[in-house]
């Protein structure tokens, strides 16, 4: 057998075993970094870079650093990005333009525009700038509130003879979204039209849409851009839907969504979230449910659950939030956003403030998700609707524990909570403890001072706002004007109006709307009408404010004329508009007209009537004496009538002396709210009118057992710079003797003219022998009569006497005012709980129908 021999090489010829070369080690390290990045392990990639630095290994080029920086930017981990930049300097690698541009983007998105400037200047020294660099620098300035610098960079770019591309145009147009620079944006649009970039790029079109919406507040121009875009995608459609919502056009947002679907585009989670917001705004539960089903079929429901919770909460017309709770309970993982959406949904329903706080406590107790500043803001708003101050203090303790109490939005919510709870001393302490007060802080506290009629402090706050150049907002003046309107201080209102003119806000739409409301509520409807007529740009709030003003003054014909003019000008009414329309019809007895408008709400404008609209219809029928029709109407409502509806009906039962229906209405009220004093008071009055004194006394006794107190009648009048308040039989005023002398004189004179006191309105059983005389004395001491007497001796004869009352004016006072206007030769303007009465020459503007 032949032997097979093997020949081995000599040791000298064997390959030498060697260490890997430095370049091989660098390639391995680079590949390791890239492998970490491809796996989404950013921290692992940066750790590999640190190992290279420790071992003294220098990467071969800038590609690795560029990849690292882009990953840091995508992950928004700017701390790691800055660490990568430090390593870049340490390794002494010369960046190329791509790497420099990534550095500008890093510092731009981290908000450090000064550092981005340094990088951009370095690029100039080394001749590394390109069009992308210029675009990135413009975007940096534009995104960090330095719009003018962005425009300057664009001008410098053009002066160098460089040709802008789509990214460059997009960056400068976004900078022009500030209203101060829209003119520059329009000039840039001219460049776009000439160079053909207008229709070439989706991003350019989107930036133009934003410029017109944010800078000009012009959705019409934004739509023109959208309509001319050659390429549309889900981003452009979603942008238009979102901007519709931001401008307060939810119906248009839904129309855009339907057009998008019909055009064959698939919606994404951002689209659906915006459309759910539109459904929530319109309270269109039917469409919201259809879209919910669509989201389930599309597999997007998990991405829009927070929007669903919000939508179901806002669409609960009957106060039920069961649907939004069901969506929340079905969620596998609850985020801080979903918890906050649910808490906010409960908070916005004032009757469920306790449940909102319980949810907040549940979130804290579970401990899986930490509340953020939005959660605390909603929790504090819920606390503001509760009467127990201890709850608010407990929530505040949780905010301090998490270091969120100093957050501006949380701190402002705390101030708002104290204001709503009428705890102004606590509100002031919270306000003064703020290290940095912003305009919202001032507005919130100022609103509280106005509510509490502390106008001296309110005007001081206004001075501070202007001195600190915080920029007085429309809300600032709205709060001031709302405060003076509530008390009827027309002098203070006129002072604020002069401030508005001085600050150049006389054409500001929200401010003008507040002025219309203020003058209307202060009894100067003609001045309100002048403000309205001088407005160049009126929205639905402007029209509704004017319509409401006419309605409160009893000018039903002017209400209907203004409403028709509003429709002719293409302005769509809202729910508040119809409350004013129905109220106007109610106060002048236009039953058929009221029915017509009630039915047209949904038929013509797709507005579903709410509880307040049904209450207006009940009031309309009751004032016309149609109690049976009103009762049947209540029983056919699509949801259970609330206390407001039954209270309206009960008041009518007292006026029309219908004891049986009155008892039924009172029982309904007490079933809904056992502590509602109006039910006991009205039923007691019904029994008294019927001569059933024992039953009347029994109602008063039950009130006393429950510690329920009837709101006392109070009237007030502004004389000089002071508000003078009067109560029934009030003798506390320094001029009480002169007031009662004038009142005695007036009573004597008006009796000579035919005035007869209506003693049937004194619903007390008196034991005195001279029963009628005592009843007359009680009538003479009503607060509105005292206030009018004071007004006649304290104000100029050339001005109307303006009196305000917190309750409905009684029939006897109403009759007496007509006579007083005759004997005094003065116009008397009286605002009660429901409306204005203009007494002049023995007649009232309400024609005795109120």
UniProtKB/Swiss-Prot annotation:
Residues 1-50 form a transit peptide. Transmembrane segments: none annotated. Residues 645-720 are annotated as: Type E motif. GO terms for molecular function: mRNA binding; zinc ion binding. Residues 721-751 are annotated as: Type E(+) motif. GO terms for cellular component: chloroplast. The keyword Repeat applies. Keywords: Chloroplast, Plastid, Repeat, Transit peptide. PPR repeats lie at residues 61-95, 96-130, 131-164, 165-199, 201-232, 233-267, 268-302, 303-334, 335-370, 372-406, 407-437, 438-472, 473-507, 508-538, 539-573, 574-609, 610-640. GO terms for biological process: embryo development ending in seed dormancy; RNA modification. The keyword Chloroplast applies. Residues 752-850 are annotated as: Type DYW motif. It is found in: Plastid, Chloroplast. Its main location: plastid. PANTHER family: PENTATRICOPEPTIDE REPEAT-CONTAINING PROTEIN, TETRATRICOPEPTIDE REPEAT-LIKE SUPERFAMILY PROTEIN. Belongs to the PPR family. PCMP-H subfamily. May play a role in embryogenesis. This is Pentatricopeptide repeat-containing protein At3g49170, chloroplastic. It comes from Arabidopsis thaliana. The lineage of its organism: Eukaryota, Viridiplantae, Streptophyta, Embryophyta, Tracheophyta.
